[in-house]
Amino acid sequence: MQVDFTIIRRGNRPLKAFVATLGFSRASYVRFFDHERNDAWLTGLREACHFFGGAPQEVLFDNASTIIRERDAYGEGDHRWHPALLALAEEFGFRPRVCRPYRAQTKGKVERFNGYLKRSFVTPLAATLKQAGLALDVSTANAHIGPWLQDIANQRSHGTTGEVPAIRLQQELPHFLPLPQALPVSPGTTATARPMPLESLQHPLSVYQDLLEVNV
């Protein structure tokens, strides 16, 4: 599994997305935050594993200081990780890995999904909200991301594999590690934002280009 934080909006109302993409199926999970501190990484990782139905054998990170404290601290390839991440890795059983410095492209699967997320979900949702005089924030984004993931993103024919991620996920699941007992709250289950039809997110993107400061 490849994980990343992608910036949706900077400034005094930041919006960021934790994104996890599986290697074989390309199934993805998203959780929005207004920061990317260590607790956000841990929450995203927990929820991603429960969303997919199991824990992957390995999780690939970038070189964020909230994840890795010192590269090669104990020898080549033997890094000093954030202790909270190590505790989570032990709880779920996965092995953390980190990209080589200045080689973030090794997380290409999740990076490509980041662009798709912004084009297909963030920008159209922000436009629909703006028409109603509302702004896209963390709680609203999390209220709508669940249905989009389940009904659109993970049900589309993937551009690389040519197959549906949700279907390929069933082939990937037998290789996952079993989940711990405790269940977290998934995005949208406690949100109070009004429901929005999924078809409202499917307009031509040219309508929305100037609505968000999006780093694609």
Segments (PLM) and residue ranges:
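RNase H-like two-metal-ion nuclease catalytic core shared by retroviral integrases
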Residues: 61-62, 75-76, 94-119, 136-137, ...
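Acidic/histidine-rich, metal-coordinating catalytic segments
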Residues: 54-77
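Mobile-element integrase/transposase regions
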Residues: 1-28, 36-44
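Active-site-proximal acidic segments at structured loop/helix or strand boundaries
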Residues: 114-216
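Short acidic, glycine/serine/threonine-rich loops at helix termini
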Residues: 14, 70-74, 108-112, 163-166, ...
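Two-metal-ion acidic nuclease core segments, chiefly of the RNase H-like superfamily
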Residues: 77-96
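Active-site beta-loop-alpha junctions of metal-dependent nucleic acid enzymes
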Residues: 30-58, 78
